[in-house]
Amino acid sequence: MGTATAQPALRPQTSTVIGGLHGAAVLDNTGRTVIDVTDFGADPSGKADSAAAVSAAMAHAKTVGGPTTLHFPTGTYHIWPERTPKRELYVSNTVGSDQAFRTKNIGILVEDMRDVVVDGGGSRIVNHGFQTVFAAIRSSDVRFTNFSQTWVAPKTVDITVADAGVVSGQAYRIIDIPETYDYAVEGTSVRWNGERGPATGQPYWTGTNSFDYSQVHDPATNRTWRTSNPVFPERHEDHRPRRRQVRITYGDSTAPGDRGYVYQMREVTRDTPGALFWESSRVTVDHLRLGYLHGFGIVGQLSEDIGIDSVTFKADRGSGRVTSGFADHIQMSGVKGTVRITNSVFDNPQDDPINIHGTYLQATAAERETLQLRYMHNETSGFPQFYPGDTIELVDKRTMLAAPGATAKVVSVTGPTGSGVPAGTDPDTYLRTMTVVLDRTLPAAVLAAPGDYVAENTTYTPTVEITGNTFQAVPTRGILVTTRRPVRIENNRFDGMSMASIYISSDARSWYESGPVRNVTIRGNVFDRPASPVIFFDPTNQDFVAGQPVHRNVLIEDNDFNLTGGTILSGRGVGGLTFRDNRVERYPHLRLTGPSRALRVGDTTTVTTDAPPPSHTSPLFTFDGADDITLANNTYGNGFNKRVNTANMDVSEITVTADGLALNADSISSAPVAVSYSSSRPKVATVDSEGVVKALSGGTTSITARATIGGVRVTSNPVKVVVATER
């Protein structure tokens, strides 16, 4: 839709409360000018493209003095990329200097504005093609609130194994394909086609079989993990049993065991962020439901004070899809002030839900007070890392410690600006390198061997508060955070993380994500069935310096660790760490697995559970190059190895109080789990104490298992057993 020719009426309003999205969002429009996007042609019926109308409404808002609310009357608004604002932008952890993706399409763009509320009014935003859903660029006091969002045809393809088995000696799968995807069976391949653009009629993207990357979600256990994709190795597509199904047969006779699994597939180019805050301050996102973010997640970059509250990152299960994000959900790269993430749900991303870090730049040359620096990771470049007046710190890559005398103020910077490449320059060189002039001469060690050092902007390091959130069905880590300012991770629930729930690195070897932590509190969280280790300090230093850990001042208290085995805490290069008043138990859960096919009278089969073994042998704690560690007044259930392993440190650095832990020696207790079984209709089939089911007569029965785990009496999921009367 085009811009309205007449100026729409300005609508001063008072307070409103709009509910329905993660509680109620309170909007105080007193003294604000409210601009209605439908006055500019936006279509709340969802029939027309509203991109140009939304852009026109925002352009008008820029001409209005004072606080402004851009309002979407309740409805469904489709936004196609062709008529959105375009900007050349370079974004952390995406495509680096690749010129093929330098131009971003932005659905809702707040640019060079102040005191703006984007109020969705409870509406649904439907995105098409490749675009950033919303962005704030060089703006302040911006709020995005009160809408849900989804994608018509995400570039992540989710397929469900509807059935699997063996027929005539050949294994097969039948896969369900959601309505949103266009596909074609081409010989022995499946070709996937994205939605077709209105201008070209061509699909926005195409792919074959399992693309470049795959992970799998098990709805029965609500777990997601990275894995190779077994659906599309050598095989033959036979026919379509039903609409939007493909039957795939294989050359072997091993029955697939993945009925019900959802395979999530994509290629790996992070061409655009899902949302972006660039050189902006006091940006708030609240009361949203984000069904899918293409390319990457919400990125804060060289910005200040960002708040995310009551946001649900979760796909609409009615769509047949489960993936809610192409990669991370939230990435804060070089942010100052406070990053506050509260009361939100993170479900089924393709990478880490939260990653908060700075960026280490490699020093390549040094002369007196001048440094040459370079972005090292291919996914990050093109934007400035320093402004005049910022503080720079040089870090020795071998120790990951600040170099003595190498902290200075920035006087001037020559390098990428984040928004373009000067004519006649090589894009890769220009976008990846910069020259920084400091207010003092560099130390002799840096001048002699600049390649041994990396640089961090310590001005753009935030205070972090992550509280009241839920992390579930995550294939990676839950929270990554590296900032020297206070970090509080409190009252969150982590369920079934596939890697460390909390990961603290400081990396000058791979991703070059900075820096050290100096004040971390992890309190009141629940870690259910976590991966090992649950909390992981893992800086990339090659050498340890006694008494100078990379990370320090960490308090971990009053948390519940409900384990299926493994290590609670692995601390490398960390000091001044206290682990106290925590509770460690076995995860009280029992899952029962049974036959996938009907039995015949007289048949027997065995049902199995995931009951834990009598004891776990992994040490509960490991420390490497650590110092001043206190483990005190924690409680431990039976069945664990209450062992503390140490390396590259003196054992006297570990203080144990009332925990009964053993240093570098096993301390294993046993807690055998007795499982009992029952059949709801024993006349149809019986089950004995070993889980052996015997079919007696035609009909259906349910088998259930029970056990006491971690002091809690638990009942398994029921397994249906069907007994046929004829052989």
UniProtKB/Swiss-Prot annotation:
Keywords: Glycosidase, Hydrolase, Repeat. Specifically cleaves the branched blood group B antigen at neutral pH with low consumption of recombinant enzyme. It is therefore a good candidate to participate in the development of universal red blood cells by removing blood group B antigen. It is an enzyme of class 3 (hydrolase). It catalyses: Hydrolysis of terminal, non-reducing branched (1->3)-alpha-D-galactosidic residues, producing free D-galactose; Hydrolysis of terminal, non-reducing alpha-D-galactose residues in alpha-D-galactosides, including galactose oligosaccharides, galactomannans and galactolipids. SMART domains: PbH1. One of its GO terms (molecular function) is alpha-galactosidase activity. It comes from the Bacteria. Signal peptide: none annotated. Its EC number is 3.2.1.n1, 3.2.1.22. Residues 220-241 are annotated as: Disordered. Residues 221-230 have a biased composition (Polar residues). SUPFAM superfamilies: Invasin/intimin cell-adhesion fragments, Pectin lyase-like. InterPro entries: Beta-barrel_GLAA-B_II, Beta_helix, Invasin/intimin_cell_adhesion, PbH1, Pectin_lyas_fold, Pectin_lyase_fold/virulence, RHGA/B-epi-like_pectate_lyase. Gene3D superfamilies: Single-stranded right-handed beta-helix, Pectin lyase-like. PbH1 repeats lie at residues 336-358, 461-483, 484-506, 517-538, 551-572, 574-603. Belongs to the glycosyl hydrolase 110 family. A subfamily. Alpha-galactosidase that specifically removes branched alpha-1,3-linked galactose residues present in blood group B antigens. Has no activity toward linear alpha-1,3-linked galactose residues. This is Alpha-1,3-galactosidase A. The lineage of its organism: Bacteria, Bacillati, Actinomycetota, Actinomycetes, Kitasatosporales.
